[in-house]
């Protein structure tokens, strides 16, 4: 096995890790099993709608307190309680961790601890070496100086502080919620014969399954390629509204986060060729004003913000993509960007999540979300309760689409974060910054395209 494959396997597995174990990287994502016969409820189109482009960017493995716990005016925390009930200051998180923290469904339950929110330090991978000392990095956070550009976006535009992950587990279900507003009770990543591929969906080899945990306690396993629930792509195609999913190529690092790979009527038909584009095309499409009405932008794994990668490098990549929109006045003046992350990643958050329709797996901790648009309320912290389906509810309402019939049906539409009558905010073109250098080689040499 060559060095490149070894490195990617470290970035691919989501197993439990201890200090003495080999360096590994979890890129968790859960697969949604379909919801049958979703009811279509017509949404009223937004009058005088200035939004012509909606961009959904989903990065990896963070909580609100991890990135914005010190943000002024937000519901953040700078301390945590340990399992003995003692209060401690949250540790300062380094730019790059040594390995991943466990964050599957069982890890959520451990961290949640029946609502006491004191079990994060018990997670495998929580204790890691930082500057020669073992530090509880699960109970840690970044400061403004560590992620200055993410903070500039949050300070300039709108920062919701009660935006919850739908599923108490890893990436896959939440990515599916970002395209379909449902997950049919899936609570884990696809596993089995896909341990040597970067796929979670219809491209998985036979024998791959994903777990579903139903509200009655029953657990089932299915192949992660679904045909009996609608995605937002289906709704858009039915109305001849343009859309694309931009991601790394098939079997490249990060491709598994392209949730449309799990939608059979898109992945296994001509729709895939029509609506799939390599992530490298996003910048040129923005520059040429050829972005579709709705875009999902999936990053390569090395700039995903997922441990073990550098958050500085991930922030720089994000700035590049958003700059491309802001540097084209016509595109910027008609765009709403939703920049969020996909699961809690094992990191602390202090807010007890609400219960969802399937209380066995819904909802999880708060996700960071920044709403970036000329029509986002400026310098605004939005305390409204949202979740991933709210981004789709916004899309439905802006475009006059029917409901997908999942959690979007009763979700808040995020209009509280916007003022479509305000003077459009100017673009905020940011500079990339110089990132720390690391001794272990290989990440920069992998073909992530």
Regions found by a protein language model. Give the residues of each.
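Generic short N-terminal amphipathic or hydrophobic helices
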Residues: 16-18, 40
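N-terminal pro-sequences and low-complexity stem/linker regions of secreted or lumenal proteins
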Residues: 37-449
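Structural motif marking the loop-to-transmembrane transition
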Residues: 12-16, 47
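N-terminal secretory signal peptides that target proteins for export/translocation
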Residues: 1-13
């Amino acid at each position: 096995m060559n060095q490149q494959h070894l490195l990617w396997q470290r970035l691919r597995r989501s197993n439990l890790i201890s200090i003495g174990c080999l360096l590994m990287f979890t890129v968790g994502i859960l697969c949604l099993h379909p919801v049958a016969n979703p009811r279509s409820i017509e949404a009223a189109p937004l009058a005088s709608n200035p939004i012509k482009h909606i961009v959904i960017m989903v990065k990896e493995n963070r909580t609100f307190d991890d990135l914005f716990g010190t943000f002024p005016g937000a519901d953040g925390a700078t301390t945590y309680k340990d399992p003995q009930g003692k209060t401690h200051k949250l540790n300062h998180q380094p730019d790059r961790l040594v390995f991943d923290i466990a964050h599957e469904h069982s890890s959520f339950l451990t961290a949640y601890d029946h609502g006491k929110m004191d079990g994060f330090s018990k997670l495998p991978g929580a204790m890691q070496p930082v500057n020669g000392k073992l530090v509880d990095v699960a109970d840690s956070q970044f400061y403004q100086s560590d992620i200055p550009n993410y903070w500039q976006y949050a300070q300039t535009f709108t920062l919701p502080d009660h935006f919850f992950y739908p599923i108490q587990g890893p990436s896959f279900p939440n990515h599916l919620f970002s395209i379909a507003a449902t997950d049919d009770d899936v609570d884990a990543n696809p596993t089995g014969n896909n341990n040597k591929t970067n796929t979670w969906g219809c491209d998985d080899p036979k024998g791959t399954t994903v777990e579903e945990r139903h509200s009655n306690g029953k657990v089932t396993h299915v192949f992660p390629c679904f045909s009996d629930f609608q995605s937002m792509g289906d709704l858009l195609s039915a109305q001849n509204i343009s859309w694309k999913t931009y991601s790394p190529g098939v079997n490249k690092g990060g491709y598994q986060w392209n949730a449309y790979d799990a939608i059979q009527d898109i992945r296994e038909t001509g729709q895939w060729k029509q609506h799939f584009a390599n992530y490298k095309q996003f910048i040129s499409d923005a520059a040429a004003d050829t972005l579709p009405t709705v875009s999902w932008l999936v990053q390569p794994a090395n700039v995903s913000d997922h441990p073990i990668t550098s958050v500085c490098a991930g922030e720089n990549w994000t700035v590049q993509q958003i700059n491309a929109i802001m540097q084209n006045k016509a595109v910027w003046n008609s765009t709403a960007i939703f920049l969020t992350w996909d699961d809690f990643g094992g990191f602390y958050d202090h807010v007890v999540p609400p219960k969802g329709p399937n209380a066995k797996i819904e909802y999880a901790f708060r996700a960071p979300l920044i709403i970036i648009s000329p029509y986002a309320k400026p310098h605004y912290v939005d305390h409204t309760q949202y979740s991933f389906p709210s981004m789709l509810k916004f899309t439905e309402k802006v475009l006059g689409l029917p409901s997908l019939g999942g959690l979007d049906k009763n979700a808040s539409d995020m209009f509280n974060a916007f003022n479509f009558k305000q003077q459009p905010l100017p673009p905020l073109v940011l500079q990339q910054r110089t990132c720390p250098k690391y001794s272990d080689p290989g990440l920069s040499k992998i073909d992530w395209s």
